Structures are given as structure tokens and as C-alpha cells.
Amino acid sequence: MAREDLSIQAPDGACRTSVFTPTKGAGPWPGVIFFMDGVGIRPVLQSMAQRLADAGFVVLLPDLFYRAGEYDPIDVGALFASPDGRKALTPFIGATDNHRAARDAESFLDHLQDRSDVSGTKVGTTGYCMGGGISLTVAATAANRIGAAASFHGGSLATDSEMSPHLLVDQIQGRVYIGAADNDGSYPPAMAARLIEALMAAHVDHRHDLYVGAAHGWTMSDFPVYHEEAAGRHWHALTALFMETLQ
């Protein structure tokens, strides 16, 4: 694993961050920001970031829970062991939101811009679960710096909240990819239709794929709902998106 652990000064403090580079070959390579899911930084996300890096990218994985202070990796098994298991996430998820993460992203983008091993003027973003909405939000708030943005099993992408990503899509300049599960209470069909309508109205270059048979969290190999076939399809879509837009 070609990994560098560092601290990036973000608006509300020092953000623990890992940067992954390809294990083979010589750079520079295009930069990508990997926005985590709501379970926090843990080995599966680090492995995913390295896999993406090995496709030919410099991947920055920030800990968006930095405002909550230091914490041990969350026990994913305990989260799903009982109905109350997910309550452990409450203080962490409350430490960030789409708007705060978008402000943080300016610092992440500056870091990538200053690295000698990063090429190009545009960066890609990808996000999972809560990170999906953050990925789309950053594609809007930093539109001139984002070449492509992806969301996989992202929730609450088109709601009545003032933080809803669909309200900002008219600012997006890059390409957008949405990978949605067909069994996801956080992103039901009516919400998907609302997001697609907003993307079309804003003339955003986008693709919206439904992963049939997949549930919320299907890309995460430490989740009970992990779907190997759909996860493989997600990798193909993600790497193709960035290879077509960031090279």
C-alpha cells in the first residue's frame, strides 16, 4: 500500500488524512478526493482508496469526523448486531454535513494542487452513503476545480432541506455519475426522479444507473449487504468516469 498519513489544516481544525498513490509506475497522476461513508475511516475504505489509486490516481481520503476528535475505528459488526447499534454513529455524523464538508474540501483541493505527483487542473470526487451527497455538493461549490463527481448509494440527494445537493446542480461544470441501489430507503424512486429532473434542467452531463438487487451500502465489503457483482460494476463505472474526464 502506497499510503501517506498526514494532517491538513481545514476550517475547523486539523483533519486527519491519508493520501494513496499507485503502487507501480511513475507519476504524476490525476487527483481524486474520496469522501467516506457514515461509518468513518476504517480498513475497508483504505483498501478501496488504494484500489482506486492503483487505477492511476492520487487519492485523498480525509476523515470528515475530525471535529469529533480522536476515535477508534468503529466496530461495523456491532452496528448491525442490534437495532440500537447505529446510535454509536450519532456524535460522529453530527460532526459534519454537506456544507461543512464542502468548506473542508477547499483545503483538500489546495493540498492536491500543491503536490508534485498530481497532474492536471481538475480533480475528481467520489463518495459513498453520506459522502455521495458531499461529492455532488463539492462538484457545485468548487465547480471550476472538479472535472467529475460520483455518488454511490448516496442518500438524501434531493430533499426539502436547504442542504440538499439537487439545489446546487445548476453550478456543476463537470460530469456526474450516480450509482443507486434499488433497495435504499435513503434514496427512493421519487427522490431519484427529483434529482434526475434537476440534473436535466441544469444540462449537467450525467449518468444515473440503478444497481438492481443491491441495497444501501452494497460497495462496502464489511457490510452484510455487500454485493460482489454490483461492487465490481461500481469499480468499472468509477474508473471509467475518471479516466475519461481527468486524463
Name each model-derived stretch.
Residues 1-247:
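N-terminal cap/leader regions of alpha/beta-hydrolase-fold enzymes
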